[in-house]
């Protein structure tokens, strides 16, 4: 194999630039030509492909985001769009494609390979940690530590004001960010999609702890585990606590 291309697809994740750097330098050291694809599958379809060298990836290992940029490409679900992408690669003599992304990106990569004979390597890059066959995906550890930082700061304010903090975190249908950050941050309650819970029972428990003198609690909610405003209302009404919602998103 003499030529490969690299793209980042879907949501960006911490560590993508370090991964790009490693791929580019390793491939060049192995005698390959390396091409970058701007804006994921969208760029692949629109032929936004350029040659990279070792200088292209200087001073990026410490940067967040992705220097290749990323974008959603809904048209990639159509076979004719995927064929156009494959034709763009073949026209440049590119024999292999490295896809850094999550489950949606991997689905697109599989179709691209199965239908058009493109050699594809997938590198799991998503904060959600929702891909099999790897303990941790690129970006997950940073996401957990970012949430932990927020929880630690919120607890100080919630304790000062005798409030309950409901912290909603990312993760889609996977509760790993909520679980890991909640445990590390000492949250009293962690709500994840994988485990059913009774919010009324939780609210009653908060009420009892309040009567015993505990005036502050942290609830960490994974985004796929329920509606934060509905949970806030139930907890407020049953426990009588002042509940504040904090949604952690693109930070």
Predicted feature locations:
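Short glycine-rich or small-residue beta-strand-to-loop segments that form or flank ligand, phosphate
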Residues: 3-10, 66-71, 95-99, 165-168, ...
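Short, ordered loop/turn segments at secondary-structure junctions
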Residues: 9-12, 37-42, 72-73, 102-104, ...
